Amino acid sequence: MLDLEVVPERSLGNEQWEFTLGMPLAQAVAILQKHCRIIKNVQVLYSEQSPLSHDLILNLTQDGIKLLFDAFNQRLKVIEVYDLTKVKLKYCGVHFNSQAIAPTIEQIDQSFGATHPGVYNSAEQLFHLNFRGLSFSFQLDSWTEAPKYEPNFAHGLASLQIPHGATVKRMYIYSGNSLQDTKAPMMPLSCFLGNVYAESVDVIRDGTGPSGLRLRLLAAGCGPGVLADAKMRVFERAVYFGDSCQDVLSMLGSPHKVFYKSEDKMKIHSPSPHKQVPSKCNDYFFNYFTLGVDILFDANTHKVKKFVLHTNYPGHYNFNIYHRCEFKIPLAIKKENAGGQTEICTTYSKWDSIQELLGHPVEKPVVLHRSSSPNNTNPFGSTFCFGLQRMIFEVMQNNHIASVTLYGPPRPGAHLRTAELP
Protein backbone atom coordinates (compact mmCIF):
# COMPACT_ATOMS: atom_id res chain seq x y z
CA MET A 1 0.00 0.00 0.00
CA LEU A 2 1.37 3.43 -0.99
CA ASP A 3 2.18 5.84 1.86
CA LEU A 4 1.91 9.38 0.45
CA GLU A 5 2.38 12.96 1.64
CA VAL A 6 -0.35 15.47 0.74
CA VAL A 7 0.79 19.02 -0.06
CA PRO A 8 -2.29 21.23 -0.72
CA GLU A 9 -2.21 23.17 -4.00
CA ARG A 10 0.99 21.36 -4.97
CA SER A 11 1.52 17.60 -4.94
CA LEU A 12 1.04 14.02 -3.78
CA GLY A 13 4.09 11.79 -3.37
CA ASN A 14 6.77 10.24 -1.21
CA GLU A 15 10.57 10.31 -0.84
CA GLN A 16 11.11 8.55 -4.20
CA TRP A 17 8.65 10.37 -6.47
CA GLU A 18 6.03 13.11 -6.55
CA PHE A 19 3.05 13.94 -8.77
CA THR A 20 3.16 17.75 -8.96
CA LEU A 21 0.43 20.04 -10.31
CA GLY A 22 1.60 21.49 -13.64
CA MET A 23 3.74 18.42 -14.37
CA PRO A 24 3.74 17.35 -18.06
CA LEU A 25 1.96 14.11 -18.89
CA ALA A 26 5.17 12.42 -20.08
CA GLN A 27 6.87 12.94 -16.70
CA ALA A 28 3.96 11.38 -14.80
CA VAL A 29 4.04 8.39 -17.17
CA ALA A 30 7.82 8.11 -16.66
CA ILE A 31 7.28 7.88 -12.87
CA LEU A 32 4.67 5.14 -13.36
CA GLN A 33 6.97 3.21 -15.70
CA LYS A 34 9.93 3.48 -13.33
CA HIS A 35 7.89 2.18 -10.38
CA CYS A 36 5.77 -0.33 -12.34
CA ARG A 37 6.45 -3.10 -9.80
CA ILE A 38 4.78 -1.03 -7.07
CA ILE A 39 2.18 0.96 -9.06
CA LYS A 40 0.31 -1.55 -11.23
CA ASN A 41 -2.81 -1.68 -13.40
CA VAL A 42 -2.76 1.90 -14.71
CA GLN A 43 -5.45 2.92 -17.21
CA VAL A 44 -5.27 5.78 -19.73
CA LEU A 45 -8.73 7.33 -20.19
CA TYR A 46 -9.54 9.78 -22.99
CA SER A 47 -12.23 10.62 -25.52
CA GLU A 48 -11.39 8.92 -28.82
CA GLN A 49 -13.63 11.13 -30.98
CA SER A 50 -13.32 14.41 -29.02
CA PRO A 51 -9.95 14.38 -27.23
CA LEU A 52 -10.20 18.10 -26.38
CA SER A 53 -13.63 17.89 -24.74
CA HIS A 54 -12.56 15.85 -21.69
CA ASP A 55 -9.52 15.74 -19.43
CA LEU A 56 -6.92 13.09 -20.14
CA ILE A 57 -6.84 10.75 -17.11
CA LEU A 58 -4.28 8.33 -15.71
CA ASN A 59 -6.23 6.00 -13.42
CA LEU A 60 -4.14 4.13 -10.83
CA THR A 61 -6.78 1.47 -10.21
CA GLN A 62 -4.79 -0.49 -7.62
CA ASP A 63 -4.19 2.65 -5.51
CA GLY A 64 -7.50 4.51 -5.96
CA ILE A 65 -5.87 7.60 -7.51
CA LYS A 66 -6.71 9.56 -10.67
CA LEU A 67 -4.40 12.09 -12.30
CA LEU A 68 -6.39 14.54 -14.45
CA PHE A 69 -4.46 16.35 -17.19
CA ASP A 70 -5.73 19.38 -19.08
CA ALA A 71 -6.82 18.25 -22.56
CA PHE A 72 -5.10 21.22 -24.23
CA ASN A 73 -1.76 21.84 -22.49
CA GLN A 74 -1.46 18.24 -21.15
CA ARG A 75 -0.24 19.40 -17.72
CA LEU A 76 -1.48 17.91 -14.43
CA LYS A 77 -4.60 19.82 -13.31
CA VAL A 78 -6.18 17.77 -10.51
CA ILE A 79 -5.05 14.88 -8.30
CA GLU A 80 -8.04 12.83 -7.10
CA VAL A 81 -7.93 10.10 -4.46
CA TYR A 82 -11.24 8.29 -4.99
CA ASP A 83 -10.70 5.24 -2.74
CA LEU A 84 -9.00 6.08 0.55
CA THR A 85 -9.00 2.43 1.67
CA LYS A 86 -6.26 1.65 -0.89
CA VAL A 87 -3.70 4.23 0.20
CA LYS A 88 -2.15 5.80 3.33
CA LEU A 89 -2.16 9.60 3.47
CA LYS A 90 -0.33 12.04 5.71
CA TYR A 91 -0.06 15.81 6.08
CA CYS A 92 3.08 17.44 7.50
CA GLY A 93 4.40 13.95 8.26
CA VAL A 94 1.36 12.90 10.37
CA HIS A 95 -1.12 10.31 9.05
CA PHE A 96 -4.78 11.29 8.74
CA ASN A 97 -5.74 8.19 6.74
CA SER A 98 -4.39 4.67 7.23
CA GLN A 99 -5.54 1.19 8.21
CA ALA A 100 -5.48 2.32 11.86
CA ILE A 101 -6.82 5.88 11.36
CA ALA A 102 -10.19 6.50 9.68
CA PRO A 103 -10.46 9.81 7.73
CA THR A 104 -13.46 11.13 9.69
CA ILE A 105 -14.53 14.77 9.83
CA GLU A 106 -12.99 14.99 13.32
CA GLN A 107 -9.67 13.62 12.03
CA ILE A 108 -9.63 16.07 9.09
CA ASP A 109 -10.41 18.94 11.45
CA GLN A 110 -7.57 17.88 13.75
CA SER A 111 -5.05 17.49 10.90
CA PHE A 112 -5.92 20.50 8.73
CA GLY A 113 -7.61 22.94 11.09
CA ALA A 114 -10.70 25.10 10.64
CA THR A 115 -12.16 26.17 7.30
CA HIS A 116 -15.45 27.43 5.85
CA PRO A 117 -18.58 25.33 6.46
CA GLY A 118 -19.07 22.34 4.17
CA VAL A 119 -21.18 22.68 1.02
CA TYR A 120 -23.85 20.02 0.43
CA ASN A 121 -24.50 18.65 -3.05
CA SER A 122 -27.90 16.96 -2.99
CA ALA A 123 -27.43 15.30 -6.41
CA GLU A 124 -24.25 13.50 -5.30
CA GLN A 125 -25.42 13.22 -1.68
CA LEU A 126 -21.96 14.47 -0.65
CA PHE A 127 -20.60 17.22 1.57
CA HIS A 128 -17.62 19.12 0.18
CA LEU A 129 -15.22 20.61 2.71
CA ASN A 130 -12.87 23.05 0.98
CA PHE A 131 -9.44 24.36 1.90
CA ARG A 132 -7.23 26.33 -0.48
CA GLY A 133 -5.96 23.83 -3.04
CA LEU A 134 -7.56 20.87 -1.23
CA SER A 135 -11.12 19.47 -0.99
CA PHE A 136 -12.66 16.55 0.88
CA SER A 137 -15.97 14.92 -0.06
CA PHE A 138 -17.93 13.21 2.74
CA GLN A 139 -20.55 10.52 2.15
CA LEU A 140 -23.85 10.79 4.04
CA ASP A 141 -24.93 7.55 5.69
CA SER A 142 -28.57 7.83 4.65
CA TRP A 143 -31.03 10.01 2.78
CA THR A 144 -32.75 10.83 6.08
CA GLU A 145 -29.92 13.19 6.97
CA ALA A 146 -30.18 15.18 3.74
CA PRO A 147 -33.10 17.54 4.57
CA LYS A 148 -31.13 19.06 7.46
CA TYR A 149 -28.57 20.45 5.02
CA GLU A 150 -30.45 22.07 2.17
CA PRO A 151 -28.26 24.31 -0.04
CA ASN A 152 -30.29 27.47 0.70
CA PHE A 153 -29.83 27.12 4.44
CA ALA A 154 -28.03 29.90 6.38
CA HIS A 155 -27.85 32.45 3.55
CA GLY A 156 -26.01 30.26 1.05
CA LEU A 157 -23.89 28.30 3.50
CA ALA A 158 -25.01 24.77 2.90
CA SER A 159 -24.26 23.52 6.40
CA LEU A 160 -23.00 24.65 9.76
CA GLN A 161 -21.49 21.28 10.54
CA ILE A 162 -20.98 17.93 8.88
CA PRO A 163 -22.48 14.94 10.76
CA HIS A 164 -20.13 13.40 13.34
CA GLY A 165 -18.35 10.28 12.18
CA ALA A 166 -18.78 11.08 8.47
CA THR A 167 -15.79 9.69 6.55
CA VAL A 168 -14.01 11.05 3.50
CA LYS A 169 -15.09 9.44 0.23
CA ARG A 170 -12.84 11.48 -2.10
CA MET A 171 -9.98 13.95 -1.83
CA TYR A 172 -8.87 16.47 -4.48
CA ILE A 173 -5.62 18.44 -4.78
CA TYR A 174 -5.76 21.40 -7.20
CA SER A 175 -4.56 24.96 -7.74
CA GLY A 176 -6.55 27.93 -6.37
CA ASN A 177 -9.72 28.24 -4.27
CA SER A 178 -12.25 26.39 -6.43
CA LEU A 179 -12.11 22.86 -7.81
CA GLN A 180 -14.70 23.76 -10.48
CA ASP A 181 -12.67 26.74 -11.77
CA THR A 182 -9.18 25.30 -11.39
CA LYS A 183 -6.66 25.30 -14.23
CA ALA A 184 -3.38 23.48 -14.65
CA PRO A 185 -0.65 25.80 -13.30
CA MET A 186 2.52 26.64 -15.18
CA MET A 187 5.14 23.92 -15.13
CA PRO A 188 7.04 24.03 -11.81
CA LEU A 189 10.79 24.65 -11.96
CA SER A 190 11.33 21.21 -10.41
CA CYS A 191 9.86 19.60 -13.55
CA PHE A 192 12.28 21.11 -16.08
CA LEU A 193 15.09 18.70 -15.16
CA GLY A 194 17.55 20.50 -17.43
CA ASN A 195 15.21 20.39 -20.45
CA VAL A 196 14.02 23.24 -22.67
CA TYR A 197 10.29 23.39 -23.50
CA ALA A 198 8.51 25.26 -26.30
CA GLU A 199 5.74 27.62 -25.23
CA SER A 200 4.86 28.26 -28.88
CA VAL A 201 6.21 27.48 -32.35
CA ASP A 202 5.39 29.81 -35.26
CA VAL A 203 6.01 28.67 -38.82
CA ILE A 204 7.83 31.39 -40.79
CA ARG A 205 6.51 31.66 -44.32
CA ASP A 206 7.72 33.37 -47.48
CA GLY A 207 6.01 33.69 -50.86
CA THR A 208 6.52 30.06 -51.83
CA GLY A 209 5.88 28.24 -48.56
CA PRO A 210 7.39 27.59 -45.12
CA SER A 211 10.96 28.81 -44.62
CA GLY A 212 11.62 28.02 -40.94
CA LEU A 213 10.43 28.02 -37.33
CA ARG A 214 10.35 30.73 -34.68
CA LEU A 215 10.30 29.12 -31.22
CA ARG A 216 9.45 30.76 -27.91
CA LEU A 217 11.35 28.63 -25.40
CA LEU A 218 11.17 28.10 -21.63
CA ALA A 219 14.07 26.94 -19.48
CA ALA A 220 14.75 26.83 -15.74
CA GLY A 221 18.27 28.15 -15.93
CA CYS A 222 20.64 29.15 -13.17
CA GLY A 223 22.58 32.32 -13.49
CA PRO A 224 25.97 32.80 -11.88
CA GLY A 225 24.26 32.60 -8.45
CA VAL A 226 23.21 29.67 -6.30
CA LEU A 227 20.98 26.81 -7.48
CA ALA A 228 18.20 28.03 -5.17
CA ASP A 229 18.06 31.23 -7.24
CA ALA A 230 17.04 29.29 -10.37
CA LYS A 231 14.15 30.90 -12.20
CA MET A 232 12.30 30.43 -15.45
CA ARG A 233 13.86 32.04 -18.49
CA VAL A 234 11.94 32.85 -21.66
CA PHE A 235 13.77 33.39 -24.94
CA GLU A 236 13.18 33.17 -28.69
CA ARG A 237 15.13 31.28 -31.32
CA ALA A 238 14.67 30.80 -35.07
CA VAL A 239 15.85 27.95 -37.29
CA TYR A 240 15.56 27.83 -41.08
CA PHE A 241 15.77 25.42 -43.97
CA GLY A 242 19.39 25.28 -45.06
CA ASP A 243 20.76 25.87 -41.54
CA SER A 244 23.73 23.70 -40.70
CA CYS A 245 23.93 21.21 -37.83
CA GLN A 246 26.06 23.68 -35.91
CA ASP A 247 23.49 26.46 -36.46
CA VAL A 248 20.71 24.31 -35.00
CA LEU A 249 22.82 23.14 -32.05
CA SER A 250 23.71 26.73 -31.16
CA MET A 251 20.04 27.77 -31.37
CA LEU A 252 18.28 24.84 -29.67
CA GLY A 253 21.01 22.90 -27.86
CA SER A 254 21.67 19.18 -28.10
CA PRO A 255 18.79 16.94 -29.23
CA HIS A 256 17.44 14.21 -26.97
CA LYS A 257 18.21 11.66 -29.67
CA VAL A 258 19.75 11.40 -33.14
CA PHE A 259 17.96 8.99 -35.46
CA TYR A 260 19.42 7.82 -38.78
CA LYS A 261 16.89 6.98 -41.51
CA SER A 262 17.30 3.51 -42.94
CA GLU A 263 14.77 4.01 -45.75
CA ASP A 264 12.40 6.55 -47.23
CA LYS A 265 8.93 5.02 -47.50
CA MET A 266 7.54 8.11 -49.24
CA LYS A 267 10.12 8.02 -52.06
CA ILE A 268 7.76 6.05 -54.30
CA HIS A 269 5.46 9.11 -54.46
CA SER A 270 8.21 11.37 -55.82
CA PRO A 271 8.73 11.96 -59.58
CA SER A 272 10.82 9.17 -61.19
CA PRO A 273 11.84 7.41 -57.94
CA HIS A 274 13.63 4.67 -59.88
CA LYS A 275 16.05 7.25 -61.34
CA GLN A 276 17.21 8.48 -57.93
CA VAL A 277 20.73 7.32 -57.14
CA PRO A 278 20.92 5.40 -53.84
CA SER A 279 22.90 7.34 -51.24
CA LYS A 280 25.83 5.75 -49.46
CA CYS A 281 24.94 7.57 -46.23
CA ASN A 282 21.63 8.21 -44.51
CA ASP A 283 19.77 11.40 -43.68
CA TYR A 284 19.36 11.86 -39.93
CA PHE A 285 16.90 13.43 -37.51
CA PHE A 286 17.51 15.54 -34.44
CA ASN A 287 14.65 14.54 -32.10
CA TYR A 288 13.69 17.32 -29.65
CA PHE A 289 11.06 15.50 -27.59
CA THR A 290 10.29 18.34 -25.14
CA LEU A 291 9.82 20.78 -28.05
CA GLY A 292 7.59 18.37 -29.98
CA VAL A 293 9.83 18.89 -33.02
CA ASP A 294 12.00 16.71 -35.28
CA ILE A 295 14.56 18.23 -37.65
CA LEU A 296 15.84 16.24 -40.64
CA PHE A 297 19.33 16.91 -42.02
CA ASP A 298 20.63 16.00 -45.45
CA ALA A 299 23.29 13.29 -45.20
CA ASN A 300 25.59 15.00 -47.72
CA THR A 301 25.23 18.71 -46.95
CA HIS A 302 24.32 18.37 -43.22
CA LYS A 303 21.75 21.11 -43.67
CA VAL A 304 18.09 21.24 -42.60
CA LYS A 305 15.71 19.83 -45.22
CA LYS A 306 12.59 19.03 -43.18
CA PHE A 307 10.78 19.94 -39.92
CA VAL A 308 8.19 17.69 -38.26
CA LEU A 309 5.76 19.14 -35.66
CA HIS A 310 3.93 16.72 -33.33
CA THR A 311 0.56 17.34 -31.63
CA ASN A 312 0.70 14.35 -29.22
CA TYR A 313 -2.99 13.45 -29.37
CA PRO A 314 -4.01 10.30 -27.46
CA GLY A 315 -4.93 7.52 -29.84
CA HIS A 316 -1.95 8.15 -32.13
CA TYR A 317 0.90 5.67 -32.60
CA ASN A 318 3.50 8.18 -31.28
CA PHE A 319 1.44 9.32 -28.28
CA ASN A 320 3.53 10.30 -25.24
CA ILE A 321 6.85 10.25 -27.12
CA TYR A 322 6.73 14.01 -27.76
CA HIS A 323 5.58 16.98 -25.73
CA ARG A 324 2.71 18.73 -27.56
CA CYS A 325 3.98 21.31 -30.07
CA GLU A 326 1.81 24.45 -29.85
CA PHE A 327 2.24 25.56 -33.46
CA LYS A 328 0.72 28.25 -35.67
CA ILE A 329 0.97 27.79 -39.43
CA PRO A 330 -0.09 30.53 -41.88
CA LEU A 331 -1.93 29.09 -44.89
CA ALA A 332 -2.22 31.01 -48.16
CA ILE A 333 -5.89 31.13 -49.14
CA LYS A 334 -6.96 32.12 -52.66
CA LYS A 335 -10.61 33.08 -53.10
CA GLU A 336 -12.46 34.38 -56.14
CA ASN A 337 -13.89 37.51 -54.52
CA ALA A 338 -10.75 38.42 -52.60
CA GLY A 339 -7.05 38.55 -53.19
CA GLY A 340 -4.57 36.26 -51.49
CA GLN A 341 -5.14 36.14 -47.75
CA THR A 342 -3.72 34.18 -44.85
CA GLU A 343 -5.49 31.93 -42.36
CA ILE A 344 -3.87 30.34 -39.31
CA CYS A 345 -3.81 26.59 -38.68
CA THR A 346 -3.05 25.57 -35.08
CA THR A 347 -2.42 22.40 -33.09
CA TYR A 348 -6.17 22.28 -32.37
CA SER A 349 -7.48 22.85 -35.92
CA LYS A 350 -9.49 20.06 -37.51
CA TRP A 351 -8.75 18.94 -41.04
CA ASP A 352 -12.27 19.55 -42.39
CA SER A 353 -12.11 23.20 -41.23
CA ILE A 354 -8.79 23.61 -43.08
CA GLN A 355 -10.31 22.16 -46.27
CA GLU A 356 -13.27 24.52 -45.84
CA LEU A 357 -10.90 27.50 -45.60
CA LEU A 358 -9.12 26.43 -48.76
CA GLY A 359 -12.43 26.42 -50.60
CA HIS A 360 -11.51 23.41 -52.73
CA PRO A 361 -11.03 19.71 -52.09
CA VAL A 362 -7.50 18.53 -51.42
CA GLU A 363 -6.17 15.56 -53.41
CA LYS A 364 -6.78 12.06 -52.09
CA PRO A 365 -4.54 11.17 -49.13
CA VAL A 366 -1.75 8.66 -48.80
CA VAL A 367 -2.73 6.08 -46.14
CA LEU A 368 -0.04 5.61 -43.50
CA HIS A 369 0.20 2.33 -41.58
CA ARG A 370 2.59 2.32 -38.63
CA SER A 371 3.76 -0.68 -36.62
CA SER A 372 6.74 -1.60 -34.46
CA SER A 373 7.56 -4.57 -36.70
CA PRO A 374 6.22 -6.13 -39.94
CA ASN A 375 4.23 -8.73 -38.00
CA ASN A 376 2.58 -6.31 -35.56
CA THR A 377 -0.59 -4.30 -36.12
CA ASN A 378 -1.18 -0.76 -34.94
CA PRO A 379 -4.11 -0.81 -32.46
CA PHE A 380 -4.91 2.85 -33.22
CA GLY A 381 -5.48 2.30 -36.95
CA SER A 382 -4.17 4.14 -39.99
CA THR A 383 -3.69 7.87 -40.50
CA PHE A 384 -4.08 9.89 -43.71
CA CYS A 385 -1.43 12.19 -45.22
CA PHE A 386 -2.51 15.24 -47.26
CA GLY A 387 -0.02 17.39 -49.21
CA LEU A 388 -0.53 21.14 -49.16
CA GLN A 389 1.75 24.14 -49.83
CA ARG A 390 5.04 22.26 -49.21
CA MET A 391 3.56 20.64 -46.10
CA ILE A 392 2.17 17.20 -45.30
CA PHE A 393 -0.64 17.03 -42.75
CA GLU A 394 -1.00 13.67 -41.03
CA VAL A 395 -4.67 13.40 -40.03
CA MET A 396 -6.15 10.95 -37.53
CA GLN A 397 -9.47 9.18 -38.00
CA ASN A 398 -11.15 11.63 -35.59
CA ASN A 399 -10.20 14.51 -37.95
CA HIS A 400 -7.48 15.95 -35.67
CA ILE A 401 -3.97 16.65 -36.95
CA ALA A 402 -1.35 14.20 -35.64
CA SER A 403 1.70 15.87 -37.19
CA VAL A 404 2.75 18.40 -39.81
CA THR A 405 5.86 17.90 -41.95
CA LEU A 406 7.37 21.05 -43.50
CA TYR A 407 9.60 20.80 -46.58
CA GLY A 408 12.24 23.25 -47.69
CA PRO A 409 12.38 24.88 -51.13
CA PRO A 410 13.75 22.79 -54.02
CA ARG A 411 17.51 22.70 -54.43
CA PRO A 412 18.93 25.29 -56.86
CA GLY A 413 19.05 23.78 -60.32
CA ALA A 414 16.42 21.13 -59.55
CA HIS A 415 13.75 20.66 -62.19
CA LEU A 416 10.52 22.56 -61.54
CA ARG A 417 8.54 19.31 -61.53
CA THR A 418 10.29 18.26 -58.31
CA ALA A 419 9.22 21.39 -56.43
CA GLU A 420 6.42 19.59 -54.62
CA LEU A 421 8.45 16.49 -53.80
CA PRO A 422 6.82 14.79 -50.78
UniProtKB/Swiss-Prot annotation:
Subunit architecture: Interacts with BCAS3; the interaction is requrired for the association with the phagophore.
UniProt main location, coarse: cytoplasm
Free-text function comment from the UniProt entry: Plays a regulatory role in autophagic activity. In complex with BCAS3, associates with the autophagosome formation site during both non-selective and selective autophagy.
Name the UniProt record assigns to this protein: Phagosome assembly factor 1
Lineage of the organism: Eukaryota, Metazoa, Chordata, Craniata, Vertebrata
Gene label: Phaf1
Cytoplasm as UniProt keyword: yes
GO MF, any single term: glutamate receptor binding
Organism field: Rattus norvegicus
InterPro entries: PHAF1 (IPR005373), PHAF1/BROMI (IPR039156)
UniProtKB keywords: Cytoplasm
Compartment(s): Cytoplasm; Preautophagosomal structure
